[in-house]
Each structure stands twice: as structure tokens, then as C-alpha cells.
């Protein structure tokens, strides 16, 4: 596991050389929030990192319900029983293994690794606009119907799940980067992803943090370029 810090955010990267999978610890004054639960075997590194910060883990936020973002959820929820688990209302169905679409959604199939045996039940379902400590919840559908991003309002760090990727080059979810095509292959709807990417770019974040790839500081121009490329196909 590799640990990288940007201001209040700690990036934990598993398998950094081969198939980098990130989750994040966001440090508050008196507590810590975990964003995503990485892979099934990632819990040891996550627990170690939480303990190193020396503050109680109060929240576990999930950007979406793919297996490489919720893999250690059950173990972490058991280890930190006071931590409140939160996911979007929409992706809470995916967390239960339900991949059916709603009538008002684009009827493209949900892709990617959907967990089938998660036992943990969320304490709160997010719809967008909620604040969890210093984090603002932003709905960003596209990679999955209920994908959610989180903006640290203290410093502008944006934790965007798989709304963008940075491994293999920056790209909007659904835009294939052949050096690392897996996020695109797992994307539900590229058109929705482009809309969400534009919403995030309009936030003018100071740093972009995603599920796959290193921190990108001052990302606005590169985000806009990636959006234009995605629009062109």
C-alpha cells in the first residue's frame, strides 16, 4: 500500500504498480472520514492508516457500489461499529446486488463488478447536497446511476470516485484509455458521465482525487480537455 497526502486528504493506494485502487481518509479536527472501501483484502492497510491518524473513524462514505470500492466494507463496518456508512439512495440498490434500471433512467445496462454478498446496511442514504463534516455530497451519475462525489469545502479537494480516471491519462468515465481501459469498460452511461464531469469541472477544484490514479493538482484545464475529448467520442 502506498500513502500520499494532499492537505487534509490521505490517498491509500493498493497495487499501485499494476492495478491501482484508491480509497481516501479525510482528516477533520477531531475525527476521520473514509471514502470508499477498496478491495476485499484492503482492510488491513485501511485500519492501520486510521490508527496512525489517531482519531476516531466516524463516517464511511461510498462513491459507488462497484466491488473495488466496497470490497472491505463489511470488515471495516465490524471493526469500526460507530462509523456511519453512507451511499447514494440510488446505488444502495446496487450494494444489495440489484442491477435493475428505473423507468426514468437511460436504459443502458449497468456494468462492472456488482457485489452480491455485502451484509452491511447503510445508516444514511444520500441524495446530494448533504454535508458530512467538511465534505459536500455531489450526485455524479454516469459510471453508475448513483455515483456520488465529495468536495472538501475547506480546500477544494474533490474526491470523485470513477467520474474521472487518472491512471493511463485523464479521462471522463466511459472514455476508453487503452493504457488503463477498465473504468470505461465498467461505465453505465457515458452521456450521463459527461454531464457529471462538467458539473465537477465547474466546481474548479484545487485537486482531483479519483479511484484510479494519483492526485492531480490544479486540474481544471485538464478536466475541461478530457470533457471535450469525451464529447467528440
Curated annotation (Swiss-Prot):
Pfam name, any one: Lactamase_B
Keywords linked to the UniProt accession: Hydrolase, Metal-binding, Zinc
Binding site for Zn(2+) 1: 64, 66, 143, 162
CDD domains according to UniProt: yflN-like_MBL-fold
Cofactor(s) annotated in UniProt: Zn(2+)
Annotated positions binding Zn(2+) 2: 68-69, 162, 212
EC number: 3.-.-.-
Annotated GO MF terms: hydrolase activity; metal ion binding
Class in the EC hierarchy, top level: hydrolase
Cofactor note: Binds 2 Zn(2+) ions per subunit.
InterPro entries named in the record: Metallo-B-lactamas, NDM-1-like, RibonucZ/Hydroxyglut_hydro
Similarity remark: Belongs to the metallo-beta-lactamase superfamily. Glyoxalase II family.
Name of the featured protein: Uncharacterized protein YobT
Source species: Bacillus subtilis (strain 168)
Gene: yobT
